[in-house]
C-alpha cells in the first residue's frame, strides 16, 4: 500500500505486509519530493520541481486564484473555470507522481488522505486518467486508488501508529539488552 497525505505538504508512506517501510535512515516514503520537472518551481526542501511544489495547499490555492485550498474547492464545485482548471492541473501532477510510485512498487492500493483529499471528487478522475496514461497496463491490474477512510486524520493516525511501532521495537530491543536499530 502506498499512502499520500495531501495538505500543507505532500507526505507519503509505503506499507509492506502491514508494516511501514522506513528506508535505510527512516525517511522511506518521501514521495512528495520526487522530482517531476527539474526546471519546475522551487520546493520548500530546496529542490526544483518536486511533486510537493505543485500539489501542496498554498500552491493549489495559487493555481486556482484563491486565498485557500478550501476556497479553491468551494469555487471549483460551484463551477468556477479557473478553480476547476487549477485543480485539474494539480490532479495531473498528482497522477504523474502516483504513476511513478505504482511503476516502482506495484502496490495493491494507493490511498489519498489529508485536507486536500477532501476534494477527491474533483481530483480522482484526473489522477486516474494520468495514472493510466503513464503506467504499463500489467502494473495497473488490481491497483485501487482510493481516499482514506480516516480523511484528514489519516496522516496523524499513521504517524501515531508509526511512533508506537518504533517505541515497541525500542522496548523489545532494550529488554533483550540490545541497542534498538531504529532511527531517532
Language-model region placement:
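Short glycine-aspartate micro-motif
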Residues: 1-5, 11-13, 42-44
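Short glycine-rich anion-binding loops that position phosphate/pyrophosphate groups of nucleotides
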Residues: 7-9, 116-117
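ATP-binding/phosphotransfer module of carbohydrate and carboxylate kinases, centering on a glycine-rich
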Residues: 15, 20, 35-184
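A short acidic/small-residue loop/turn micro-motif
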Residues: 27-30
Amino acid at each position: 500500500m502506498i499512502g499520500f497525505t495531501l495538505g500543507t505538504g505532500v507526505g507519503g508512506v509505503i506499507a509492506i505486509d502491514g508494516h511501514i517501510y522506513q528506508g535505510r535512515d527512516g525517511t522511506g516514503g518521501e514521495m512528495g519530493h520526487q522530482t517531476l520537472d527539474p526546471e519546475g518551481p522551487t520546493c520548500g526542501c530546496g529542490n526544483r520541481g518536486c511533486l510537493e511544489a505543485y500539489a501542496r495547499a498554498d500552491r493549489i490555492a495559487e493555481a486556482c486564484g484563491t486565498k485557500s485550498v478550501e476556497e479553491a474547492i468551494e469555487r471549483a464545485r460551484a463551477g468556477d473555470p479557473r478553480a476547476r482548471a487549477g485543480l485539474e492541473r494539480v490532479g495531473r501532477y498528482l497522477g504523474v507522481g502516483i504513476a511513478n510510485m505504482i511503476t516502482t512498487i506495484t502496490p495493491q492500493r494507493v490511498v489519498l488522505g489529508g485536507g486536500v483529499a477532501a476534494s477527491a471528487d474533483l481530483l480522482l478522475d484526473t489522477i486516474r486518467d494520468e495514472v493510466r496514461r503513464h503506467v504499463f497496463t500489467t502494473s495497473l491490474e488490481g491497483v485501487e486508488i482510493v481516499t482514506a477512510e480516516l480523511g484528514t486524520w489519516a496522516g496523524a493516525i499513521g504517524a501515531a501508529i508509526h511512533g508506537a511501532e518504533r517505541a515497541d521495537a525500542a522496548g523489545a530491543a532494550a529488554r533483550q539488552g540490545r541497542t534498538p536499530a531504529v532511527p531517532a
